Amino acid sequence: MASLSGPISPTSLEMFKPGVEEFNPSKLLLLSNHQEGLLYPTILGSLELLSFKKERSLNLQRDKVCLLHQESQLLKLRGTGTDTTDVLLKQPMAISVNCCHDGTFTTWEQDRMPNTSTAPTLTESSGSLVTRLILIPRLTLSIGIQVAMRLFRLGFRLARYSLKVTILKAQEGLLLIPDLLRAHPIEPLVQDHVVEPILAIEPPPLV
């Protein structure tokens, strides 16, 4: 090492000049892809690929990313009884890899594809829908009437009292229906028939 005192010669400056690493062909390493048997070069100590091999390596890297994505999707569908024949045809269309010109790969993302709605379409007419809306209360009322008749036959006073309170509350709700319809109008599908107030019916005498 040259002394720090005195003038510095040009030869001593060359000792501190950073050495430039020249390209050594022996550092060319071939990595094999075990899935497809592909060979693409990787240069140790270099940040970019060779110019004459850059485009070819870029395509191989693109295929490698796509193959890994397809394999992960097929592993998810394995054992579920799903037919994966169409998956291999549709996935390459939905995958894109963002690559820069210098060979650097960025994160890949799914392309924007038209989303097909899987919700069931409404195929029944409005008349059948109204019929279903009418049949649901009838079924509920028939079950309630059967339960009430059994309780009356058993003669439980507490059960008869609770049924009487329920009937009175139901009659009160029927009388309030017209006012509720004016305050909160409903859809035209159910508003075809004018709802009229139902007169209060005398409850059956308790035994």
UniProtKB/Swiss-Prot annotation:
Membrane-spanning segments: none
Keywords for the protein's UniProt record, in alphabetical order: Virion
Pfam families: Corona_I
Superkingdom field: Viruses
InterPro entries noted in UniProt: Corona_nucI (IPR004876), N2-like_embe-CoV (IPR044311)
Cellular component aspect of the GO annotation: virion component
Subcellular localization, as worded in the UniProt entry: Virion
Known function: Structural protein that is not essential for the viral replication either in tissue culture or in its natural host.
Note in the entry: The gene encoding this protein is included within the N gene (alternative ORF).
Similarity-based family: Belongs to the coronavirus I protein family.
The protein's name in its UniProt record: Protein I
Source organism of the structure: Porcine hemagglutinating encephalomyelitis virus (strain IAF-404)
Organism phylogeny: Viruses, Riboviria, Orthornavirae, Pisuviricota, Pisoniviricetes
